[in-house]
C-alpha cells in the first residue's frame, strides 16, 4: 500500500518541598499583517496544520472603563448569584482562566475535561474564586457552555455558574482578554490575582491562542502586552501573583519580558506540552496549604504536573515546566546583551561557523520531525556550550538564568527552564519572522546579533563541498568501518552529519528501503568522517513472538541520548480505515536498545498552526505495520548510476503484526542480512545539505 504523501520525507528530510531550584519597531499594522501572511502561507503549504473552521471578520469590540459595552450578567436561573453580591466577600485569590477552546475542544473535549478536573478536585471555593472565560471553539462538549459566544463562569463545588456574556468575540482580540481581566478585577475582591492562559502556544514568534471561529487568529506578544497593559489592574499598579501558560513553547525569556510589567511570576513550558496539559488538582493543594503567593502556587502547579505524567502513563512523555521570577528578567537581558556583544564581534572577525556549530548542538524545542520549525533553544544550554568562546560572559549569563528560573520539573535532558528564539534550521521564514520578532520590543543588541548571524546563514555557501561524486570507503585497517575524507575547510564549516542505511529489497530489483538514519558518526583526527553502525536495527515485537523490522529516523540527539521516530500504520480492530502514527524511542545508557516514550499522531493538516502532542494509545488486538521509505536506482545513458539525490522516491508498508498486550520496540541484530548501501548526508553550518554517493555492501 503506497502512501505518496510520505515519499520524500526521509531522503530529503525536509507539599511540594522536594522540588529543586534549577539552580522599537516597524509600524504595528505592517508587522501584524506580515504575521497574518506568514500564517496563511504556512497553512497553504501544509508545513503546519491549517484551520478550516468558520472564518469571520473580527467583531467590533467597544471597551469602556467598566469592561465591554453591553457586557451583561447572565441569569442562568432564578437563584443565579448577583455579581455585586459575589464581590462583597474578599477571597484569598481570584484565578482567571482564559480558555480558548479551539480545535482542542471541538475535536477532543480537552477544555471541558480540564474544567471538570478543576471542579472535581475539591478546592475551597470560598478562599479561591475561579473565573473561566470560554470561547474560541466551534462547539463545546460541556452542555452548560454556550457555542458561538464568549461567556464568563464562576466555578464552584456545584459546577459552572455563568455570570456574564461577552457575545461573539474573537479571543485573539486584545480587548477580549483585557475585558475579562477588568470584569474579574472589578467584580471579585481578593488579596491576590492570578491567571492561566489555556490553549495552543507557538512561542514568542507565533504567540498564544488560536480562535477556531476567527481563522485560528492568535495573540501576538505585542497584542498580549497591549491587552494586559490596558487593564484596570495595570492602571492601579496591581500585578498578578503569577501568570501561567497551559500551552506549548511559551517558556521563553521574550515572553517573560513581556509579562514582567504585569506579573511577579510566570509558569510555562519550553517544550511542547504533553497531551493532557496541566493537572488541575493543584487547586486543591493551593487551598489546603494556603499557597497563594506566586512561588508557592508554582510549586503546586509543577508538582502536580510532573507527578501526573510520571504516574498515569504507560509511556511517560517528554515534559518540561518551569517558574520564572519576573523581577529577574532584566538581569538576564543585561547579561545576554554582554554575551551577544562579544558574539557580534566574533561574527565580524569571521567566526560565524564557530557560533553556528554551537547553535547546531544546543537543545532545541518543538521538534515534530527531524527538522525544527520553531527555532527555539534552551538559553542556559546555549550559553553553557558557548563557554569555550566566552567564559566570563557565559558564566554570568548562566548565573542570571539560574537566579531567574526558581523552579523546574523536566524529564528532558539539557533543559533549564528558559528558551530563546535563535533562527538556524527554519531558514525559509527568517526574514519575515525577524520582522515579527523585532516588533516584540526585546533586546536591541540581541536582535542585531541575530540579524548579523542570519545574514551569513542565508548567504552564499562558505565552502565548496562537491561530495556527490564521493562514496564512503572501507577502512583497510578496520574492516566493516566506512568513512569519507573531508578537507580542512569542510571540517571548519561542518554543522553535523548523519548516515543512511538502505537495504536492498529482495522482491524488487534495484529498490532500496531505508532502515536507519542516524547521527551516530565520528570525525577522526585526520578529518575522516566515520559511521558507527553496529549492525542493529529497530524491531517491533510482541509477547506472542511476532516481530517486524522498522524504519528509524533520528530526530534528536544529545551528549548521552538519541531519540528516534518510527513511522507506523495503525489499524484498530474496530476501525474502518488505518491511521498514521509515530513511535518515539529514546536510546541512552540506561536503555541501550531503546525505550518507547510514546506514540503520536501524524500532523493534522486540518488543525491549527500550533504544535500538538497528544499521545496515541495502542491496544491489544490492533494491527500495526511499519511505514517504509524506498528509492529506486536511476541510471545514466552510459549505464552508470546517477547521484543518490536523483533516485526515484517510493514508499509503502511492511508486514502487519497484531498486537498483544505486551509489546515493545527495540534495537536488535537481524536474523538475516541483505545487501545494503550506506551513504552520508552532510549539513554545513549554513544548513545546506549534501549527499555522498552510496557504497554497496554485499551480504
What do these predicted ranges mean?
Residues 18-32:
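Short, Lys/Arg-enriched N-terminal segments with co-localized hydrophobic residues
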Residues 94-99, 129-134, 193-197, 241-245, ...:
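Structural recognition of the beta-strand scaffold that forms the well-ordered cores
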Amino acid at each position: 500500500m503506497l502512501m505518496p504523501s510520505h515519499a520524500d520525507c526521509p531522503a530529503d528530510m525536509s507539599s511540594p518541598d522536594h522540588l529543586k531550584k534549577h539552580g522599537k519597531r516597524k509600524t504595528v499594522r505592517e508587522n501584524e499583517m506580515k504575521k497574518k501572511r506568514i500564517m496563511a502561507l504556512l497553512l497553504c503549504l501544509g508545513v503546519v496544520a491549517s484551520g478550516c473552521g468558520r472564518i469571520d471578520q473580527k467583531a467590533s469590540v467597544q471597551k469602556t472603563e467598566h469592561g465591554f459595552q453591553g457586557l451583561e450578567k447572565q441569569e442562568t436561573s432564578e437563584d443565579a448569584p448577583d455579581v455585586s453580591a459575589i464581590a462583597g466577600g474578599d477571597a484569598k485569590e481570584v484565578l482567571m482562566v482564559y480558555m480558548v477552546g479551539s480545535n482542542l475542544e471541538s475535536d477532543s473535549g480537552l477544555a471541558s475535561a480540564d474544567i471538570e478536573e478543576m471542579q472535581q478536585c475539591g478546592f475551597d471555593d470560598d478562599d479561591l474564586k475561579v473565573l473561566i472565560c470560554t470561547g474560541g471553539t466551534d462547539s463545546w462538549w460541556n452542555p452548560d457552555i454556550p457555542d458561538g459566544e464568549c461567556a464568563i463562569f464562576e466555578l464552584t463545588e456545584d459546577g459552572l455558574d455563568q455570570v456574564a456574556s461577552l457575545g461573539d468575540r474573537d479571543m485573539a482580540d486584545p480587548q477580549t482578554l483585557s475585558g475579562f481581566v477588568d470584569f474579574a478585577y472589578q467584580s471579585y475582591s481578593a488579596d491576590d490575582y492570578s491567571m492561566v492562559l489555556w490553549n495552543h502556544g507557538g512561542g514568542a514568534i507565533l504567540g498564544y491562542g488560536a480562535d477556531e471561529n476567527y481563522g485560528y487568529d492568535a495573540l501576538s506578544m505585542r497584542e498580549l502586552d497591549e491587552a494586559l497593559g490596558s487593564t484596570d489592574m495595570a492602571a492601579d499598579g496591581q500585578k498578578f501573583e503569577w501568570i501561567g501558560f497551559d500551552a506549548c513553547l511559551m517558556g521563553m525569556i521574550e515572553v517573560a519580558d513581556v509579562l514582567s510589567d504585569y506579573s511577579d511570576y510566570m509558569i510555562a513550558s519550553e517544550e511542547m506540552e504533553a497531551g493532557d496539559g496541566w493537572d488541575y488538582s493543584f487547586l486543591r493543594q493551593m487551598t489546603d496549604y494556603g499557597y497563594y503567593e506566586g512561588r508557592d502556587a508554582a510549586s503546586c502547579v509543577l508538582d502536580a504536573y510532573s507527578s501526573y505524567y510520571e504516574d498515569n502513563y504507560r509511556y511517560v512523555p517528554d515534559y518540561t515546566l518551569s517558574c520564572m521570577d519576573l523581577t529577574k528578567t532584566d538581569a538576564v537581558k543585561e547579561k545576554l546583551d554582554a554575551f551577544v556583544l562579544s558574539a557580534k564581534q566574533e561574527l565580524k572577525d569571521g567566526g560565524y561557523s564557530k557560533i553556528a556549530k554551537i547553535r547546531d548542538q544546543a537543545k532545541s524545542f518543538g521538534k515534530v520531525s527531524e527538522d525544527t520549525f520553531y527555532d527555539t533553544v534552551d538559553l542556559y544550554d546555549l550559553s553553557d556550550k558557548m563557554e569555550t568562546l566566552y567564559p566570563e560572559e557565559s558564566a554570568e549569563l548562566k548565573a542570571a538564568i539560574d537566579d531567574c528560573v526558581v523552579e523546574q520539573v523536566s524529564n528532558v535532558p539539557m533543559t533549564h527552564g528558559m528558551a530563546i528564539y535563535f533562527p538556524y534550521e527554519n531558514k525559509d521564514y527568517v526574514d519575515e519572522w525577524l520582522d515579527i520578532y523585532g516588533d516584540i520590543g526585546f533586546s536591541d543588541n540581541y536582535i542585531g546579533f541575530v540579524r548579523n548571524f542570519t545574514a551569513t546563514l542565508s548567504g552564499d555557501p562558505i565552502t565548496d563541498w562537491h561530495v556527490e561524486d564521493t562514496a564512503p570507503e572501507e577502512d583497510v585497517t578496520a574492516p566493516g568501518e566506512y568513512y569519507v575524507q573531508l578537507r580542512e575547510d569542510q571540517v571548519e564549516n561542518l554543522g553535523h552529519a548523519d548516515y543512511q542505511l538502505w537495504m536492498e529489497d529482495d522482491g524488487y530489483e534495484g529498490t532500496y528501503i531505508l532502515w536507519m538514519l542516524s547521527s551516530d558518526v565520528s570525525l577522526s583526527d585526520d578529518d575522516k568522517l566515520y559511521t558507527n553502525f553496529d549492525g542493529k536495527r529497530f524491531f517491533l515485537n510482541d509477547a506472542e513472538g511476532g516481530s517486524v523490522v522498522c524504519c528509524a529516523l533520528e530526530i534528536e540527539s544529545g551528549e548521552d541520548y538519541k531519540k528516534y521516530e518510527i513511522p507506523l500504520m495503525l489499524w484498530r480492530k474496530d476501525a474502518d480505515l488505518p491511521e498514521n502514527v509515530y513511535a518515539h524511542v529514546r536510546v541512552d545508557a540506561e536503555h541501550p536498545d531503546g525505550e518507547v516514550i510514546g506514540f503520536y499522531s501524524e500532523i493534522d493538516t486540518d488543525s491549527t498552526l500550533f504544535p500538538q502532542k497528544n499521545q496515541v494509545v495502542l491496544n491489544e488486538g490492533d494491527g500495526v505495520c511499519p511505514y517504509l521509505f524506498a528509492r529506486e536506482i536511476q541510471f545514466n545513458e552510459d549505464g552508470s548510476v546517477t547521484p543518490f539525490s536523483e533516485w526515484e522516491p517510493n514508499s509503502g508498508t511492511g508486514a502487519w503484526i497484531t498486537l498483544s498486550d505486551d509489546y515493545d520496540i527495540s534495537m536488535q541484530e537481524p536474523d538475516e542480512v541483505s545487501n545494503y548501501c550506506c551513504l552520508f548526508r552532510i549539513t554545513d553550518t549554513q544548513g545546506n545539505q549534501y549527499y555522498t554517493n552510496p557504497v554497496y555492501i554485499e551480504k
